[in-house]
Amino acid sequence: MAWDTEGLVGPEGADWRVPVQELENRRARLSVALSENGIESALIDDPVELYWLTGGRQNGIILIGGKDSDVQTTHWVKRSLERAKFESGGDDCPDPVIAQPRMADLANSIREIGGTEKPATLEGKIPHNRWKFISSKIKSLVGESKDCTSIMYGLREMKSNWEIDMLRESGRINKEMFESIKEKGGLGKTELEMAAVADNVSRKAGFGGRIRMRKWPMDCDRVVIVAGESASIPSYFDSAIGGVGASPISPLGSGHAKVKSNSPVTVDIVHLHRGYVSDCTRIFSAGTLSRVWMERLDHMAEIQKAVVSSLSQGDDCSKAWEIGSFMAKEMGYSDNLMGMNPDKSHFLGHSVGLELDETPVIANGFNRPLCIGGTMAIEPKVIYPDGCIGTEDTFVRTEDGMECLTMGNSFPLFTDWD
């Protein structure tokens, strides 16, 4: 081999691989879930789900056998096989990691490791053409291929202790990004100038450059800074804040507007630590804000506290939405909560993990609680023609209630640069 796996390290030579025990537990959970749903096996090839199951994001597929099946779980890799072996634990890999067969031989390869039925696929996530291609290669197997997307999403809602540690570290770095903006932002600075300052902190800490989302065709700017009127400009993105963005091909978030005196600047930052999302929002200004703006901020903090309390008690996410949106209505914010008509968003929080837009969501229709181990960013905001104000932190639900994984009270809701 012409290269050395010793180069596959994090900062200061740290081993950033997912622990093998994590991979074993995840595969075991999926294996049980497949059998509970009458599925012999599942063929997984989406990059995020592959990472969750294999610890890497190489070009390949993994076949997970159901607990009650005779299928040998196998990770097939097209490129790079040696890297995939290392990232899955090297000699301690939970299951075989071997070269991917020709797709024309996929059905026979499945038979060789104990499969007889068409495996389930991520029909609800992968591109339709990819699904059609895989389906054409497994048509000689018996039965009908089922969609295992909801099974995978459901399993990933409940984070392990290791994953929660990753989110907590993500939150720590997120706070450092805010501290850099506190230090170097201010009057006359452009939104993009300040975003670059935060980006620098994130990159030095190991951010890989991608924010992954489920909902097509969503992509996002992870350092959204909107000064004054910029916050009222809508975008394609399903969020309270739009923003001008850098150009028409990037019409979201930080743009070329400059900070003005006594006007709210909303800073909404996403950081990923080893893939895991933390999401926070705080308000800045160059000079004092009016009493009206500060009252609005206090109200958003009250709404966030009520939503967190509801989730902590085990209320359905739809109930938490009802509580928060009713409070906003009583406070007089119906026309401004999470945007202005006709560009409003209708949620108060979203689950996070390896993706920014995981489930459940604080919105109508999510008639189930956030599970123990579930992680969620809760972000009440109000938008007006002259600006936005609100707050956001990322939480995990534990047996004892909701725990903040990000800045919480350690960084003020409002910072005056002057």
Predicted segments with their positions:
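Active-site neighborhoods and metal-handling regions in enzymes and metal-associated proteins
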Residues: 1-418
